[in-house]
Amino acid sequence: MMNSSQTLVVKLGTSVLTGGSRRLNRAHIVELVRQCAQQHEKGHRIIIVTSGAIAAGREHLGYPDLPATIASKQLLAAVGQSRLIQLWEQFFSIYGIHVGQMLLTRADLEDRERFLNARDTLQALLDNRIVPVINENDAVATAEIKVGDNDNLSALAAILGGADKLLLLTDIEGLYTADPRNNPDAKLIPEVYDISDELRMVAGDSISGLGTGGMATKLQAAGIAGRAGIDVIIAAGNKPDVISDVIEGNPVGTRFHGLESPMENRKRWIFGAPPAGEIIVDHGAETAICEKGSSLLPKGIKNIKGDFSRGEVICIRSLSGKDLAHGVCRYNSDALRLIAGHHSQQISQILGYEYGAVAVHRDDMIVS
């Protein structure tokens, strides 16, 4: 048993909470709460990222026959979110532990000030021995402001909470060399130090659970958290004492090792914030950014996707679509469209103003 206190984010997907059925599996949730409470009592800090609001809403309303629309999903989430937090509160109260609900959207994470506010709230809950229960605010989130899935949300929560480890609980034991339900020769991959393209291909062929996130989104989450120095473990939610094993460092599931030299807090935000748009760059800019550590100049920009403001985080991509870097843009999308392909000396002439010679400065950039 490790003596030092750890901060652990536990992400529970819909498949874990329902056991693959239409109802929330309360007995299983109680067991997971027992494990969390046990570690909480030992001085560890636990953060819950929970799915299941839509499933809880559907169950509470008696499985209504609703059209498969965004409005119907948001209706179910609005009804179910209160039921879901009541369950967590009820089960943690068995052990005398309070919970605090945090509902987040992408907008809370891509704006630096709101990111810091969310971080301060999360830290205040942890400092007061309250277990944060986090979910995406599905009742109000639109496609433009959704993080997209709770795997990536849990990685962002791990960054917000300064976590040591992120545990992604699912319905299989971890990442396999192939889908174990279709291939009897599939083998569990116990440890990962680098998320290669080959590994992404393996994950892309593997489906996990009934929710929005499969194994591919879990690899995305592992990449985000790993860059911040956070270990990520994918494991089966029904494995006995899985949370204790993760805290104690026992081999379980697939462990993705975080970087030994994690990025500073500002760069954690840059890498963690969902991009507000994309900048497509030419081969020269790609080489300058990836091999020389240079800033992005307007001259190297070929295309801009999306609408974003100055100071927002954007994704820089190659002509082939490869994710090269994330960074804080010094010009808004409209201005970039005007100066793209031009020399920096022409910025003031084209726009009538300038915020410097670069579109994204290397100090405000994280290379992927």
UniProtKB/Swiss-Prot annotation:
EC nos: 2.7.2.11
CDD domains membership: AAK_G5K_ProB, PUA_G5K
GO-annotated cellular components: cytosol
PROSITE patterns named in the record: GLUTAMATE_5_KINASE, PUA
Binding site for ATP: K11, T170, D171, T212, G213, G214, M215, A216, T217, K218
PANTHER family: GLUTAMATE 5-KINASE (PTHR43654), ISOPENTENYL PHOSPHATE KINASE (PTHR43654:SF1)
Family: Belongs to the glutamate 5-kinase family.
Role, per record: Catalyzes the transfer of a phosphate group to glutamate to form L-glutamate 5-phosphate.
Protein name: Glutamate 5-kinase
